[in-house]
Amino acid sequence: RSCEICHNVGNDCDYDYVQECDSPEDQCGTVMLEGSLAPFSVRTIHRNCFSSSLCKLEHFDVNTGNGAYLRGRIHCCDQQKCEGRPFPGLPLSYPNGYVCPGVLRGLFSDSSESEAACKGDETKCITIVGYRKERFLGDIAYNIKGCVSSCPELILSNRTHEERRNELIKVECRDAAKTTPSE
């Protein structure tokens, strides 16, 4: 299988090329990412070869606290070029009494860990640590912690670190802590 490859800031690619996929990356896909550290946000698009297990994730939304979040939409297909799915508006939700550690390191310079107040149906804490190897940018390390509504099934890879690959080092998901109201 061959897939279109591109990485760009915004919602579309200014450039692209086609690359043969290596096993186990057997599907073409597009990942749309949106990261926010209030009041700033940035969207990026990534077209690449993906494993079908990553394609099953479809979307994720991580509340990292203090108005910061990371969300992604994953769309895989059988064509070389998969169109990205648009982001829905952010839901209006209120704190629900659960808390998690929160950090968004690697995407923004302010990456100190804090407490994330979970909102709406967020009752789980997630930690994702890894890096992305990029041909032009070098390695992009990331450490993401925050509240989520459910735990994704992400599998760590034992493959060698190949060019332009996303390498997960740590994925943990657990129940969030319930805060006790102060009197």
UniProtKB/Swiss-Prot annotation:
Cysteine disulfide links: 3-28, 6-13, 21-49, 55-76, 77-82, 100-125, 118-147, 151-173
One cellular component GO annotation, for this chain's record?
extracellular region
Q: Which InterPro entries does the entry link to?
A: CNF-like_PLA2_Inhibitor, LY6_UPA_recep-like, PLipase_A2-inh_b-type, PLipase_A2_inh_N, Snake_toxin-like_sf
The record's section on Pfam families has:
PLA2_inh, UPAR_LY6
Q: By its UniProt entry, which Gene3D superfamilies does this protein fall under? A: CD59 (2.10.60.10)
The entry's note on the tissues where this protein occurs is: Expressed by the liver.
- Provide the primary localization: secreted
List the subcellular locations.
Secreted
Recite the UniProt keywords alphabetically. Disulfide bond, Glycoprotein, Hydrolase, Phospholipase A2 inhibitor, Secreted
Q: Any signal peptide, and if so, which residues? A: none
Q: Which residues are glycosylated?
A: 158
Q: Name one GO molecular function term.
A: phospholipase A2 activity
Oligomeric state and interaction partners are given as: Heterodimer of subunit A and subunit B.
Function according to Swiss-Prot or TrEMBL: Phospholipase A2 (PA2) inhibitor. Inhibits the enzymatic activity of PA2 of Deinagkistrodon acutus. Also shows a wide anti-hemorrhage activities to D.acutus, Naja atra and Agkistrodon halys venom. The native protein is more potent than the recombinant one.
The family assignment reads:
Belongs to the CNF-like-inhibitor family.
> What is this protein's name?
Phospholipase A2 inhibitor gamma subunit A1
- Give the originating organism: Trimerodytes annularis
Output the lineage of the source organism: Eukaryota, Metazoa, Chordata, Craniata, Vertebrata
